[in-house]
Amino acid sequence: MILIKNAKILTPKGIVEGNLKVEGKKISEIGGKAVKSDVVIDGSRKAVIPGFFNTHTHAAMTLFRSYADDMQLHEWLEKKIWPLEAKLDDKAVYWGTKLACVEMLKSGTVFFNDMYFFPEAIARAAEECGIRACVSAAFFDFFNPDLLELNLKNAVKSLREIEKYDVLRAIGPHAVYTVSLDGLRRAAEIAEEMDIFMHFHLAETEKEVLDFKKQHGKLIVQALDEIGFLSKRLIAAHSVWLEDAEIEILAKKGVSVAHCPASNMKLCVGKAIRYEAMKRAGVNFTLATDGAASNNNLDMLEEMKFAALLQKFHHSNPTLLKAEEVFEAATLNGAKAFGIKSGVIKEGYEADIVLVDLAKPYMQPEHSLIANLVYAASSGCVDTVIVKGEVVVEGGVFRSEEEELKIIEKANEVAKRLTGSA
């Protein structure tokens, strides 16, 4: 049992000052008396908040952080990223993912939804680090029927291999410009048969949308709906260049959208996601960082601020995407997307908890905790992180300094090998 004493607890009904008790993997009591516990955490001058759910990542791309920046998207991919990715192996992905897990946990993220190569290495790294994850078996067919059969077979094989790990699973058909409509239809059938999620890039750029419409004579979401691709299993990353009719379809089918504001701005996708239209339609709107090669960090505190400011600036309206809304997108909505009873501090919910240090200068004065978290905070305020009832970060340190330093060292060795600078 874990007892957090004398904290400011952010609940759905407001801030409760007092104690919080964790039994097993659940929050068992809020505001009760202090009792003898296995672990006692002093919550003085700290706030208890729900952990963040990062709903679209390529975790091992931490290895490419700041390797290639300030470039056009296609040039960036073709000249810098893809040549390095061709050299990846399971060891590289394992250490790159571990580095990402440490970074995410230390900035308050308790869950990430990943799409990358070598899913077994990703699942193993996540489980060892004690973070929640949904691991995708990425799938491409490049419009080649033979490649479709081969790569689908390999994806299913990978999904079966990671079943032994304590992670959720997804099939990850990459995008409409790398996977045929038949491949997308087959991926949806596999997700249904295996009772797993789907992870997909949708309408990230105008070029993607225009090329698809020229080829198929219809909007992407309409075509996806016709082949049975859309459901509550689907997490659609980006979803920037969508029309009203498409947004309505996504809402009707229960699709969750993963908004990646920092990556969208850095890679210049051309406009801001249509948050207000999604809100009106009832789309489950979540938040994500994308990969560290295009962000360049995995800090959800920073991502909340980017999301809110992008809407305000793009639409010249300071009232859009309020602090409370973006905080919910980063926590509760992400948990909802994956059917996890988490994302809020509430009795009976999963103990995915972050303690933030209110003594930091940028967390004062305390007019509004949520506004401070969204507009003022940095990852430096994260003191303690609990995932599934287990303490994984304490005093701002991931488990032990020795383990953290080893992960950083190994990831650097791999990065140097990949770039030829070893």
Curated annotation (Swiss-Prot):
CDD domains: ATZ_TRZ_like. It comes from the Archaea. It catalyses: S-adenosyl-L-homocysteine + H2O + H(+) = S-inosyl-L-homocysteine + NH4(+); S-methyl-5'-thioadenosine + H2O + H(+) = S-methyl-5'-thioinosine + NH4(+). Zn(2+) binds at residues 56, 58, 201, 290. SUPFAM superfamilies: Composite domain of metallo-dependent hydrolases, Metallo-dependent hydrolases. Its EC number is 3.5.4.28, 3.5.4.31. GO terms for molecular function: 5'-methylthioadenosine deaminase activity; metal ion binding; S-adenosylhomocysteine deaminase activity. Pfam families: Amidohydro_1. Belongs to the metallo-dependent hydrolases superfamily. MTA/SAH deaminase family. Catalyzes the deamination of 5-methylthioadenosine and S-adenosyl-L-homocysteine into 5-methylthioinosine and S-inosyl-L-homocysteine, respectively. Is also able to deaminate adenosine. This is 5-methylthioadenosine/S-adenosylhomocysteine deaminase 1. It comes from Archaeoglobus fulgidus (strain ATCC 49558 / DSM 4304 / JCM 9628 / NBRC 100126 / VC-16). The gene is mtaD1.
